[in-house]
Every structure is written in structure tokens, then in C-alpha cells.
């Protein structure tokens, strides 16, 4: 079931692109230049504690509650979700019981659950699991992103997985962590990387959400 997002309230928005913290070398290597930050706000906050969660290698997926009905979409309005994933999403979020949970939890508020569709046949997801599923990493109600505790409460209500917190720490600590090429916390997969957010929700002077990622492949 796919929602036509044209004309729908802008909080049905796509998840923002998450940038790496550092600039890339422009002299041919294309490698990240550690310490040369792309965003002044991230540079300012680099020694603060950030919450780092595991970045899952899958397909970005939105579960959308418009106040009355649930629907599913990919990262962009045109993105096509695999049929196996749509079937799993219907299992996790479809039907009368889940509709009652949406109504009880959110009423007529506009809600987007952001997650990753992952598993066999999606990217290199077969090492995570042999089937496909959805793992929650963020949620937005009426244009406001929710706290980690709220996200965990939603995951509990629907009996779905949520991306694990790997640690709280600085940007440099996250970089050193991925340099060690750690194992994923799921299945036998190698970890793709980490996504970091300040312990409190922040935006920069342009109103852009402060969030970043460090990927293993960028530090090999």
C-alpha cells in the first residue's frame, strides 16, 4: 500500500540525507580529511557526548500514519519497496489490531516511523538474517522528532526491532570505533557504520538537523 504524498502535509517528508562529518579530499583521493569538518555546528559539538546507533545496510523505509490509515513508502516518493518487504510491513503494521494501536498511540496525529528494510535480497543483508524485516531508527510526529525513549516505546508497542545504541561518546571516539571494522550486533554481518545524534535534539543556524554518520568503508 503506497501513499501519494503530493499535497500531503510536509511532515510526511523524506528522511534527511545524513552527511559524513568531514570534507573529502579534492585532489583525487576522495578520502575523508579527518578534522576538517563540513558543518561548523558538528565541529563545535565534536567533544560533546553523542548517541551512536548502528547503521544498518538496507533500504530506507517510511511507515506513515495519516491519522486514519497506515501506508508505506521508500526513502523518496518514487522509490519502490521490494514485494517481500511490503508483505512484512503489512504483517507488522497492517490489520485491525495494529490500526487500533496506531489510534491508541497517536490518535489523529500525523506520524512517520522511519526504519530500514533489511535482510535477504536487500543490499548485502543476507548476513543480517535469512528473511526480510523492518528495524526502526527514528520517528516524527507532526513535524517533531521523538526522543530515543519514545522511539523504544513505539517499537515495544508494535513488537518491532529498534536499532541498537552502540555507545555514547565523541565524534573522534566514533571514528576510532569504525576503524576497527567491528561486527554488526545483528546476525553475522560486518557493521556498516554508526549514526550519531547529540543527546538532545539540535539544529544548526540554517534550521538543519544535526546528525551525522561514520561508515567503516570511509576509514579503510
Located regions from the model:
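Core nucleotide-handling region used for phosphoryl-transfer chemistry
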Residues: 6-220
